[in-house]
């Protein structure tokens, strides 16, 4: 029920360091907490947004390498929650697809190995079956607040 930006509450969810960007010793940080946003809804929203903003950083890193990303495939238990896929779409600023449960990580690893072994040839494609698609208006201000906090804490 919380609004985008969790009423000014931002979380860097670095509970075990962070991989994107590579900060293995980083720690988690809640920023902007006050009496108005220290409620379960805003805390949950900040946690979801923080986790997803880490994925936005990964997408941005790929784009900086010249990879064109038009949509995002969201997998895992949390992806089944329509609120999370909607928040993800607004943070990514692009379509989010949620397939039926499957072994997508193992399949992706096998496809990547096949691609590497075949010298860059196109790996076999997988039919995702029935897919739920979500596309929401972007919320760049949430990503901006996350990145500001991330950058401010780089040397912690």
Identify the residue ranges that each predicted region occupies.
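Glycine/Thr-rich phosphate-binding loops that ligate phosphate moieties of nucleotide
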Residues: 1-156
């Amino acid at each position: 029920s919380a609004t985008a930006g969790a009423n000014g509450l931002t979380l860097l969810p670095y509970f075990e360091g962070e991989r994107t960007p590579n900060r293995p010793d980083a720690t988690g940080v809640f920023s902007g907490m006050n009496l108005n946003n220290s409620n379960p809804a805003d805390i949950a929203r900040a946690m979801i947004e923080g986790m997803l903003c880490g994925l936005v950083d990964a997408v941005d890193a790929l784009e900086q390498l010249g990879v064109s990303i038009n949509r995002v495939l969201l997998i895992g238990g949390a992806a089944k929650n329509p609120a999370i896929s909607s928040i993800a779409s607004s943070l990514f600023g692009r379509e989010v697809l949620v397939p039926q449960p499957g072994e997508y990580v193992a399949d992706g690893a096998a496809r990547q190995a096949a691609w590497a072994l075949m010298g860059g040839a196109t790996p076999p494609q997988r039919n995702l079956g029935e897919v739920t698609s979500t596309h929401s208006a972007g919320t760049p201000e949430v990503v901006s607040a996350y990145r500001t906090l991330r950058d401010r804490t780089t040397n912690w």
